[in-house]
């Protein structure tokens, strides 16, 4: 038995120590480090939404628009958070409501808030139209989905 182990030790010389992993260098332009996929390193993107919300309703009528959402955040099947808002005022003409993962909604809220601040700093009197916000959101969500790191919101 010892002779088998000794012969193998020469074959595997230079490998990782017991309990360690081989480090595969990333290829130029790769999105994901192959070592993390092959050897079970921590995944740095959301695989399953944790805190989710469900219902958002928008109604258009002759005098304007009404948007409503429930305030429940579910942690799996547990009704965990009972007072979270999933509606955001982007500017004077645009509101955003989101269902799905609450963390992704918070991310979108932060990015859109910064975009609006940057636009207001120009001081030209213009702001983002609802069509411009919609266009940006569709491109941003498609871009993330294309990179296999989707935003889990609708």
Curated annotation (Swiss-Prot):
The modification N-acetylmethionine is found at residue 1. Its main location: cytoplasm. Residues 1-45 form a propeptide. Keywords: Acetylation, Cytoplasm, Nucleus, Phosphoprotein, Proteasome. The keyword Repeat does not apply. It is found in: Cytoplasm; Nucleus. The keyword Nucleus applies. It holds the Pfam family Proteasome. GO terms for cellular component: cytoplasm; nucleus; proteasome core complex; proteasome core complex, beta-subunit complex. One of its GO terms (biological process) is proteolysis involved in protein catabolic process. The modification Phosphotyrosine is found at residue 102. Belongs to the peptidase T1B family. Non-catalytic component of the 20S core proteasome complex involved in the proteolytic degradation of most intracellular proteins. This complex plays numerous essential roles within the cell by associating with different regulatory particles. Associated with two 19S regulatory particles, forms the 26S proteasome and thus participates in the ATP-dependent degradation of ubiquitinated proteins. The 26S proteasome consists of a 20S proteasome core and two 19S regulatory subunits. The 20S proteasome core is a barrel-shaped complex made of 28 subunits that are arranged in four stacked rings. The two outer rings are each formed by seven alpha subunits, and the two inner rings are formed by seven beta subunits. The proteolytic activity is exerted by three beta-subunits PSMB5, PSMB6 and PSMB7. Forms a ternary complex with SMAD1 and OAZ1 before PSMB4 is incorporated into the 20S proteasome. Interacts with PRPF19. This is Proteasome subunit beta type-4. It comes from Sus scrofa (Pig). The gene is PSMB4.
């Amino acid at each position: 038995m010892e002779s088998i182990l000794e012969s193998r030790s020469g074959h595997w010389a230079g490998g990782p120590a017991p309990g360690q992993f081989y480090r595969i260098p990333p290829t130029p332009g790769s999105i994901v480090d192959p070592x993390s996929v092959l050897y079970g390193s921590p995944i740095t993107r959301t695989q399953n939404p944790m805190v989710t919300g469900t219902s958002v309703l928008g109604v258009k009528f002759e005098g304007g628009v009404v948007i409503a959402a429930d305030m429940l955040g579910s942690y799996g099947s547990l009704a965990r958070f009972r007072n979270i808002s999933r509606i955001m005022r982007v500017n004077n003409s645009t509101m955003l409501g989101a269902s799905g993962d609450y963390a992704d909604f918070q991310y979108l809220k932060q990015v859109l808030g910064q975009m609006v601040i940057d636009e207001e700093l120009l001081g030209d009197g213009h702001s983002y139209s609802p069509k411009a916000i919609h266009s940006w959101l569709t491109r941003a969500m498609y871009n993330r989905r294309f990179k296999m790191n989707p935003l889990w919101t609708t």
